[in-house]
Amino acid sequence: EQSIVDRAYTAYTDDSDDIGAVSGWDRDRHDEIVQIGFRLANKLGHDSVAAVDYVQEFTALMSEEDMQQMPQSVVTDPGSVEYPLIGPREGIEQEQQRLDEGSLLAHYRRLNALDGGSFAWINDQHLYATAFEHSEPGEYTLLKLVTAWIQRNLHIASNIWNAPDTDGERVLVVYGASHIPGLRQILTSTPMMAPVSPLPYLGGS
């Protein structure tokens, strides 16, 4: 809720050690919202941080009967399919190696890239692979995994639209890499919002 985020951000800007005492706030000081969101907002001099996230599990739209059809993991084994698919662990290891050999700037650029096969697409690719591999004509139960993920991003996009206090105000959106493809598609498709890539604002451009 916005009121909880407001109290947490105020506690952070006053004394970050007190943030854990905020009623209703269940994130610790090491959480990405605090370490990235609050820290960046404070550095930029923002008075508040908008609560735009919408928490929803992949299985949120599935019934107990649907859950019985769930595979052990929503991650598809790349070795079990005949098309290119990078496993999450392999993707993380590859990105860690690039980070070890490169720079943080290059790392952040890659995380925000939407090229085919980029790190940001891994989550979507595995959701689609799992849903389609376990579906057949007339049986679409596991497509609910994809539907829930898209629905979550739709709720987030709606919250982003309602975040500004005035028309024309710009909003800086900070999200995990896996949300970038879905949010970019939604925000680009809307007639009232125009997403702008953060890449030119990263130094060295």
Please state what every model-predicted region is.
Residues E1-E136, S197-G203:
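Structured, acidic catalytic/metal-binding patches in enzyme active sites
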Residues E139-S205:
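A cross-kingdom marker for long, charged
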